[in-house]
Structure formats: structure tokens, C-alpha cells
Amino acid sequence: MTSPSDAPLGSPGSPGGRILVVDDDPVTRRVLSSMLERAHYDVMASTDGREAWTELAAARIDLVITDREMPAMDGMELLRAVRQSPRHGGVPVVMLTGTTLETAGDEADAEGASAFLTKPVSSRELLETVERLLRGTARSA
């Protein structure tokens, strides 16, 4: 028998989490949101870093998934703002990019990204990353 703490975070009866998806591409936002919602996460979406920062100020967010390159405030700027914030500094941030440049991942690591994924990302890779990060946050909280 599986206890609630042994169940995958996104499964029915599990604690889940509220995830903020940030991407300027509406199709990408919709696809990522759908993957997460099917796994029973509460998903909010923003079109850029500025909008995401407003959402972070207004709601409890457990994890942020952000595109690296966006107009207005890009994912790297959002990551820096989150890491410098006393309130949000511990929120896991997953950086997404369409580029395969190794330097993109190195830069995200240097700025404090919790994980770095390359688009297109599979549902399995996304959900495994999210569950690992949320479980780590729950343990350290």
C-alpha cells in the first residue's frame, strides 16, 4: 500500500504544488501547462518575466518554469530577481531554452537555476524534474 508521502507529487491524493509557467510563446505555455495539469498540479501562466514577478508577489508559488529568452524581462532576469528576494529566494526555478549551447546551462547554473531543460522537453523529463525539486523543497522546508 502506498502512503500519500510515497505517491508521486502530481498523482491524485498527493500534495501537488502550484507551478508558474513563464513563456512568451502561447503554444509552449499551453503544452507545458497541459502536461503539468494532467499530473494534477495547479498551474498559473505568464507571458514574460515582469508578469511572472507580479504573479509571484500576489500568489503562493511552489516552483517556476521559465523560458530563458523572452521580451520585457527574460528568464535570466527573473531568476536573478527570485534568487535576490528574501521572500522567494528558495523557490525552485527551472530554466527552459530552445538552444543547445552549453554556455546557456552554465549561465543558468551560475545564477542559481534549480534545473536546466532544453526544448522540446518530454513530459516524463519535465515531471521528473518538477517532482524531484518539489520533494527537495518539502524536505528542506
Where in this protein do the model-derived segments appear?
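Active-site beta3 strand of CheY-like receiver
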Residues: 59-65
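C-terminal output helix
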Residues: 121-131
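Receiver (REC) domain active-site loop signature in two-component systems and cognate sites
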Residues: 70
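Charged docking surfaces used in two-component/phosphorelay signaling
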Residues: 30-38
